[in-house]
């Protein structure tokens, strides 16, 4: 579907320079002299490179519609992650580097959304929050009120986050998977 350059919004996926790009940030600019344009920060969906582009209102770009399917995480097999389509029960195998650092958050039966373009997976979205147990937490230093009131802790999947001082080892906490931050106790 063709759209004008000034209609690009954050989250839109467009075809540009032979690749698929997602708009991360957009800024409509109206200079005193010359025509208005849309300054867009793009991120390549395949290799993650970033690009800043200007699109005039008169330019048209191809907006791509991605198919989004729900999959359930089954298991890990070496460097491969195995998912199952919840509608057709077909299995999908993705490499760990496709998911990136967030692969550590995958748990058996976890529902994820896989973005497909022409039946080929190009992106994956994990739940925004997961519940995990704390395996290690530093003891609280009494009277340390001038500094930040957070202490380092290690989750059951090996990821280090900062937690409030009242969180102890063995407790379950809710973690933001995008920012890798503590949200609350479970």
Curated annotation (Swiss-Prot):
Q: Which GO terms describe its cellular component?
A: cytoplasm
What highest taxon heads this organism's lineage? Bacteria
> In which pathway does this enzyme or protein participate?
Protein biosynthesis; polypeptide chain elongation
Query: Where is it localised?
Result: Cytoplasm
Q: Which GO molecular function annotation, any one, does this entry have? A: translation elongation factor activity
Q: Which PROSITE patterns match?
A: EFP (PS01275)
- Key words of the record: Cytoplasm, Elongation factor, Protein biosynthesis
The record's annotation in InterPro entries points to: Elong-fact-P_C, NA-bd_OB-fold, Rib_uL2_dom2, Transl_elong_fac_P/YeiP, Transl_elong_KOW-like, Transl_elong_P/YeiP_cen, Transl_elong_P/YeiP_CS, Transl_elongation_fac_P
Q: What is its main location?
A: cytoplasm
Q: Name one GO biological process term.
A: peptide biosynthetic process
Q: What does this protein do?
A: Involved in peptide bond synthesis. Stimulates efficient translation and peptide-bond synthesis on native or reconstituted 70S ribosomes in vitro. Probably functions indirectly by altering the affinity of the ribosome for aminoacyl-tRNA, thus increasing their reactivity as acceptors for peptidyl transferase.
* PANTHER family in the cross-refs: ELONGATION FACTOR P, TRANSLATION ELONGATION FACTOR KOW-LIKE DOMAIN-CONTAINING PROTEIN
By its UniProt entry, which HAMAP family does this protein fall under? EF_P
Q: State the family it belongs to.
A: Belongs to the elongation factor P family.
UniProt xrefs under NCBIfam families: efp (TIGR00038), PRK00529.1 (NF001810)
Name the UniProt record assigns to this protein = Elongation factor P
